[in-house]
């Protein structure tokens, strides 16, 4: 057990959250650069150089310059082993992001310093609040003109309801960006442009009162001293206990594109972020130091390797140790499986995992038996909780251009729904197929992937569906009566769960009044 504890103590598993275009994928690249996982960072937008960002590996992401699926990357840094989960930056992919946040122990929140707190960031912070996830904040894009840093921190505190403790402080911004002052280390790190793709030594001046500071940045030195007097009086000091409870966030400033300030964030994560945490199950709390292996699946990704048309289930290890060839118990289906070919990830590059410990993410080859939310143990029968499915907000009927490909269409849709990209509903009374999504872009992704991966050309038609609810009832007789009377509004989802498809909210409310013994659920545990 002591060997396990040593490995657990080394792990830091975190995700990056942000509003689209705040620079999340760029910062992912630079984090990997500092972790020696990349020799030269790709940049996301424009892509004239042909360097696609390493974490945006799916074809559609490369075309659009947005992160659609969750990538997992592991690298060593500062004596720790860091697992970074890159989440979709586009607002349409909140479900995938939500599930990813159930698999991490801390988050890095990236904010565009010219814009401040944006809508998507607010939503994601609400999700992290559900588990009191510790948050590290990075104020990005200092190489552009930014809002007043004190105003930015005030906004984070008032809008996101979390105290801010500045760790670094900017000196100028935009064309006048000179560098940052590291408050805890009492040193100024000078900025130099044009160093975005490689790691080079920066000039560091020790001490805010060092006369060399005037020589380096002129009148900005006196301004910095004045500003720091103000900042110290107006802001919180870093409190590790408050950070671990999700009540306070350490704030770093920098520019991901200029590769500046990223190492400070990583230093902070390694030093302060929690090691793998205990996990709730429906039977007990599972401690990471336990000897027996446990884990849960938070994502399924189809066709990570177009050459092999495979599916991989992403599993967070919660306790014990994975060893190549070990036997695992797949709790939902009650079967034991031998796993000899689990994978580790470097964003699309896959290597066979010899071993893995709590906090690590491994990939299991999935031939249709594994679903999101599945728990694996070494024999114990319990289920990890807290991996939800949300009722979709948009619906379309999907039609084939070639009616003979109905079988391939259904197979493709079921596989895409199993990986959580979209939800599929098959009405009980008709042969229609209804696709439900959280945002419009998901519909485009599904049609694109059906064509490229399943050779199926499909189109959408409008359908009068406003919302969906999963239907439950303990009384089998009442459920059967409900099925008979409301069959025109009932469908089965991709997992064959009974679902009520409501044409309007009025219709849903009337049905809920008419059938008080039936539960109409907005979310469903996987």
UniProtKB/Swiss-Prot annotation:
Function: Increases the formation of ribosomal termination complexes and stimulates activities of RF-1 and RF-2. It binds guanine nucleotides and has strong preference for UGA stop codons. It may interact directly with the ribosome. The stimulation of RF-1 and RF-2 is significantly reduced by GTP and GDP, but not by GMP.
InterPro entries, A to Z: EF-G-like_DII (IPR053905), EFG_III/V (IPR035647), G_TR_CS (IPR031157), P-loop_NTPase (IPR027417), PrfC (IPR004548), RF3_C (IPR032090), RF3_dom_3_sf (IPR038467), RF3_GTP-bd (IPR041732)
Family the UniProt entry places it in: Belongs to the TRAFAC class translation factor GTPase superfamily. Classic translation factor GTPase family. PrfC subfamily.
PANTHER family named in the record: PEPTIDE CHAIN RELEASE FACTOR RF3
Domain tr-type G: 9-277
Residues that bind GTP: 18-25, 86-90, 140-143
PROSITE patterns: G_TR_1, G_TR_2
Main subcellular location of this protein, as a coarse class: cytoplasm
GO MF term (any one): translation release factor activity, codon nonspecific
Claim: Protein biosynthesis is one of the keywords in the record: yes
GTP-binding among keywords: yes
Location relative to the cell: Cytoplasm
Domain of life of the source: Bacteria
Name of the protein in question: Peptide chain release factor 3
A Gene Ontology BP annotation from the UniProt entry: regulation of translational termination
Keywords associated with the record: Cytoplasm, GTP-binding, Nucleotide-binding, Protein biosynthesis
GO CC terms in record: cytosol
């Amino acid at each position: 057990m002591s060997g396990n504890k040593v490995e657990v103590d080394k792990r830091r598993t975190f995700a990056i959250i942000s509003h689209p275009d705040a620079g999340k994928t760029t910062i992912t690249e630079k984090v990997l650069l500092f972790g020696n996982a990349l020799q030269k960072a790709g940049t996301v937008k424009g892509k004239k150089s042909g360097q696609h960002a390493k974490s945006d590996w799916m074809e559609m992401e490369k075309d659009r310059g947005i992160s659609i699926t969750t990538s997992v990357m592991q690298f060593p840094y500062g004596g720790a082993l860091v697992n970074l989960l890159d989440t979709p930056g586009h607002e349409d992919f909140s479900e995938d992001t939500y599930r990813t946040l159930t698999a991490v122990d801390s988050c890095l929140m990236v904010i565009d310093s010219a814009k401040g707190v944006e809508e998507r960031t607010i939503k994601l912070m609400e999700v992290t609040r559900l588990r009191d996830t510790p948050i590290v904040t990075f104020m990005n894009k200092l190489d552009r003109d930014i809002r007043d840093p004190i105003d930015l921190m005030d906004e984070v505190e008032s809008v996101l309801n979390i105290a801010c403790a500045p760790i670094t402080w900017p000196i100028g911004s935009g064309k006048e960006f000179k560098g940052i002052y590291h408050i805890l280390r009492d040193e100024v790190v000078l900025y130099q442009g044009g160093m975005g793709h490689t790691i080079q030594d920066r000039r560091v001046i020790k001490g805010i009162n060092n006369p060399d500071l005037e020589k380096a940045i002129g009148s900005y030195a006196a301004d910095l001293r004045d500003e720091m007097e103000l900042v110290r009086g107006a802001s919180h000091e870093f409190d590790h206990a408050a950070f671990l409870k999700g009540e306070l966030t350490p704030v770093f400033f920098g520019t991901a594109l200029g590769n500046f300030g990223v190492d400070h964030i990583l230093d902070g994560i390694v030093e302060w972020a929690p090691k793998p945490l205990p996990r709730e199950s429906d039977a007990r709390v599972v401690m990471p130091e336990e000897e027996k292996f446990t884990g849960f699946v938070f994502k399924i990704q189809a066709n990570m390797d177009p050459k092999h048309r495979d599916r991989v289930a992403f599993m967070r290890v919660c306790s014990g140790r994975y060893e190549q060839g070990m036997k695992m118990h797949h709790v939902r289906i009650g079967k034991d499986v031998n796993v000899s070919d689990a994978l580790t990830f470097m964003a699309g590059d896959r290597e066979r995992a010899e071993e893995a410990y709590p906090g690590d993410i491994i990939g299991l080859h999935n031939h249709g038996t594994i679903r999101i939310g599945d728990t694996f143990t070494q024999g114990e029968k319990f289920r990890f909780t807290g991996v939800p499915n949300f009722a979709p907000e948009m619906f379309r009927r999907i039609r084939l251009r070639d009616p003979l490909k109905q079988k391939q269409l259904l197979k493709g849709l079921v596989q895409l729904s199993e990986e959580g990209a979209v939800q599929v509903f098959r009405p009980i009374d008709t042969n229609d197929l209804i696709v439900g999504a959280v945002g419009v872009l998901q519909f485009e992704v599904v049609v694109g992937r059906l064509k490229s991966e399943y050779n199926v050309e499909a189109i959408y038609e409008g359908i009068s569906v406003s919302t969906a609810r999963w239907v439950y009832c303990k009384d089998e007789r009442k459920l059967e009566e409900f099925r008979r009377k409301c069959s025109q509004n009932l469908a089965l989802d991709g997992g064959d769960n009974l679902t009520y498809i409501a044409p309007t909210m009025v219709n849903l409310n009337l049905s809920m009044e008419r059938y008080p013994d039936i539960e109409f659920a907005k979310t469903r545990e996987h």
